[in-house]
């Protein structure tokens, strides 16, 4: 069988001088040169001749009569035999993929309007004549850039899902540790009680065991989900990297659907701890409420000492708005319309009538109680804020600004989320217990008298947070206790 090189050399001898492709239905003109019938016909249609002037040969420029060209059947037979040799030598190779399926010509161009790869014959077709047509490599450049951007986005998404996995696994570990700690303390406390309390012990332990199992189950489901997401992203990245290394024709094949897949593929950002599971964990202390009459002291210990460390906090005079009057021990604050002669230091609130605690938290579980005494029309805001909270000018109290708080107003209570939400409570609280779990990211508010849950924020703390208090209304005041 003839070698591929010799066949290719022979094929070059029977190329059309106009389209540079293999002769199709070859015709001969007066000078003896041969052309594709279609190419020569289109050449004669070009309106570039003066009236009465004969067209010239595209190769030697000799004039010829337009109607004098005749089919060259012998040359057509030679071309057909060369084509057979050419196809035989390319059998099993990838060269065949570079051939236009319609005209059997090699593709050189890419139509950006129709997103089609064109041979020289396709390029001259009327449907592409007024389109933007570029060489394959030139057309591939912008698409390579788009793929590169998609790869960068996918890699960032992959890194983000890995960060989520690490963060959520850390939260799971903290919750498992908390559950284990609660379990041991529940056992030790119930060991000193009567048979009546032993029944309660069994109930609580069973709930904790279910929570333990549910947390582990959620962890396994979360790990499977994250592993699947990572696998899908890695597969897509590998596919794009492999496609980006292909020749321009392969890269441009079905390029639009590939880009759409990249642009529409976004990672899910799952949470390892569902709101329902988190609510069950937070509500665990409330399961002991039936014991309130028999052992109020034990109930308080079960509700908070099993979960949180009492925080002995005091107000920071350096942050207090000039309209807030602090007690000498910095445990109480009262609103006054009279401005105090306070230095305007960077830490002080100058517009929002607020004050921070002297000390903040970077870890652990802490709780404190705020007793509120509101005058008519007054309000008190309690919660925690991030260390870099805005002190000067207007303060927007919402989680996006680093504020996790509830507002007790005359007749209603609101959770200050992205949009303030009025809460339906059985009793308007006069004492609010604020609890923070730094590692898990919970800020919980409970009626300190009735133990009725008020609200819980979920956050991801990255810096120091401080207990936060706001007060409004002449005569309104609050005091602190652990």
UniProtKB/Swiss-Prot annotation:
It comes from Sus scrofa (Pig). E3 ligase that plays an essential role in the differentiation and survival of terminal erythroid cells. May directly bind to PTEN and promote its ubiquitination, resulting in its proteasomal degradation and activation of hypertrophic signaling. In addition, plays a role in immune response regulation by repressing the phosphorylation of STAT1 and STAT2 in the interferon/JAK/STAT signaling pathway independent of its E3 ligase activity. Mechanistically, interacts with the intracellular domain of IFNAR1 and thereby inhibits the association of TYK2 and IFNAR1. Belongs to the TRIM/RBCC family. Residues 293-482 form the B30.2/SPRY domain. Its main location: cytoplasm. The keyword Lipoprotein does not apply. Keywords: Cytoplasm, Metal-binding, Zinc, Zinc-finger. One of its GO terms (cellular component) is cytoplasm. A zinc finger (RING-type) spans 16-61. InterPro entries: B30.2/SPRY, B30.2/SPRY_sf, Butyrophylin_SPRY, ConA-like_dom_sf, PRY, SPRY_dom, TRIM/RBCC, Znf_B-box. This is Tripartite motif-containing protein 10. The gene is TRIM10. GO terms for biological process: innate immune response. Signal peptide: none annotated. A zinc finger (B box-type) spans 95-136.
């Amino acid at each position: 069988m003839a070698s591929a090189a010799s066949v290719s050399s022979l094929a070059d001898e029977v190329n059309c001088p106009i389209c540079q492709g293999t002769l199709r239905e070859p015709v001969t003109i007066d000078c003896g040169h041969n052309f594709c019938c279609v190419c020569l016909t289109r050449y004669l249609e070009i309106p570039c001749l003066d009236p009465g002037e004969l067209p010239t040969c595209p190769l030697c420029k000799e004039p010829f009569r337009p109607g004098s060209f005749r089919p060259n059947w012998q040359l057509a037979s030679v071309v057909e035999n060369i084509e057979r040799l050419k196809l035989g030598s390319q059998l099993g190779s990838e060269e065949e993929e570079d051939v236009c399926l319609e005209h059997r010509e090699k593709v050189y161009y890419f139509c950006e309007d129709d997103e089609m790869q064109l041979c020289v014959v396709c390029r001259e077709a009327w449907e592409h004549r007024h389109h933007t047509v570029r060489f394959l490599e030139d057309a591939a450049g912008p698409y390579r850039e788009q793929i590169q951007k998609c790869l960068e986005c996918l890699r960032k998404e992959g890194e983000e899902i890995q960060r989520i996995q690490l963060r959520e696994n850390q939260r799971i570990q903290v919750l498992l540790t908390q559950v284990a700690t609660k379990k041991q303390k529940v056992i030790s406390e119930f060991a000193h009680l009567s048979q009546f309390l032993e029944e309660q012990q069994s109930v609580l332990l069973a709930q904790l065991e279910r929570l333990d199992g549910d947390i582990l189950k959620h962890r396994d489901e979360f790990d499977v989900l994250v592993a699947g997401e990572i696998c899908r992203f890695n597969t897509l990245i590998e596919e794009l990297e492999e496609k980006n290394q292909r020749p321009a024709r392969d890269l441009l094949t079905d390029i639009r659907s590939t880009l759409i897949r990249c642009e529409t593929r976004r990672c899910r950002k799952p949470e390892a701890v569902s709101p329902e599971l988190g609510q069950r964990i937070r509500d665990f202390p409330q399961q002991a409420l039936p014991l309130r009459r028999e052992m109020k002291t034990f109930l308080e210990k079960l509700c908070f000492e099993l979960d949180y460390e009492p925080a002995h906090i005091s107000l920071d005079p350096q942050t207090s708005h000039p309209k807030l009057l602090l007690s000498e021990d910095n445990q109480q604050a009262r609103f006054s319309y009279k401005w105090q002669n306070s230095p305007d230091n960077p830490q002080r609130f100058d517009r929002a009538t607020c004050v921070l605690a002297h000390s903040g938290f970077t870890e652990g579980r802490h709780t404190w109680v705020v007793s509120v005494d509101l005058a008519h029309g007054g309000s008190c805001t309690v919660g925690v804020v991030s260390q870099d909270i805005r002190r000067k000018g207007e303060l927007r109290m919402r989680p996006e600004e680093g504020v996790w708080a509830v507002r007790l107003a005359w007749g209603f209570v609101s959770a200050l989320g992205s949009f303030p939400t009025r809460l339906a409570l059985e009793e308007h609280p006069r004492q609010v217990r604020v609890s923070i779990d730094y590692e898990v990211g919970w800020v919980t508010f409970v009626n300190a008298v009735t133990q009725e849950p008020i609200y819980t924020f979920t956050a991801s703390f990255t810096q120091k947070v401080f207990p936060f208090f706001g007060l409004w209304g002449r005569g309104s005041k609050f005091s602190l206790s652990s």
